Amino acid sequence: MRDFKHFGVKRRFFPDRNYNAIWCNLKTIRLGEGKALELPSGESEFYDVGINTKCNAECPFCYVSATGKGVNYPNICETWKKWMSTFWETKKKEIILTNKPFQIAIGSTGEPTIHPEFCEFLKTVYESGVVPNYTTNGITLALDSDLSEQLLDATRRYVGGVAVSFGNKSLRPYARRAIEKLIECGETKINIHHVISDIKSVDEFIQEWNAYGNLILYHVLLPLMPSGRSTTGIEEGVWEYLEEMIQKNHIENVAFGAHFIKNLRTSKIKTWLYDEESFSKNVILTENKVQITPSSFNLQPIQTIQF
């Protein structure tokens, strides 16, 4: 497993927000006491990044309604470089002081692996001192093609972690093959995204957790939301069953989507909680324009940076 120690130790410090964070080798430690205030939208610790609205899956539950008729935003590498040039970074002794984001997750508005600039974009983000991660349905990775090999090579060289979605049952053969290839690659952390909607979806998550063991860093649980193409949400009583099964099986390598926060506040499962969108925002990266939105569920821009 490759590490990011060569990125150094980084610190982001906003005393007026009661925020003090140290990052090293893909781990973030937030220091201090009391509650940190929401960070400025243009200086978030972490961003979800949308580089297209195009997708090769068109899942019925997609919360952004991405389709095969969507678009790949052009010149994303140049736009990223221009945006990163607006941040500051300085070294004090052995610590890098910065207001740059520590990491990003690519794929908030479409399937990133089908963007023609994607591999180059991973390199561009990496060379800017920010760790690129991405979410995928697994189709491109799973296929035996030159593009798949190029993507695996770029992932091996530049990426911190890959999240493979298991939400669409018809695509799971692709998702499984993608995970097999990532495991064989051995150079990146692997997560699985599970959409939790009913009792059966919980049972399927437990089954996959048992099957993969410690090969998966985190199983990320996302509640079905009535957004985009989905018209329904998680069924009543499913959270209680999920909570019971996690405790019964002593599952520790699990993470929860932000929309579970209300359940987690009173849950028996011990987790670190912070307000939704307080340290992160979503970005839509188009040609010479960065649009910052509250989240990937709310794509209404709250800040636009034009170059």
Label for each model-derived stretch:
Residues 70-74, 161-305:
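Radical SAM enzyme [4Fe-4S]-AdoMet core and its adjacent flexible, acidic
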Residues 1-48, 66, 280:
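N-terminal [4Fe-4S]-dependent radical SAM core
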Residues 46, 65-78, 94-115, 125-143, ...:
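Core AdoMet radical
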Residues 80-84, 88, 118-122, 148-152, ...:
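Generic structural signal for well-ordered alpha-helices
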Residues 38-82, 86:
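Canonical Radical SAM [4Fe-4S] cluster-binding loop centered on the CxxxCxxC motif
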Residues 58, 109, 286-289:
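Residue-level recognition of short loop/turn positions
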Residues 115-116, 232:
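Active-site cleft segment of glycoside hydrolase catalytic domains centered on the general acid/base Glu
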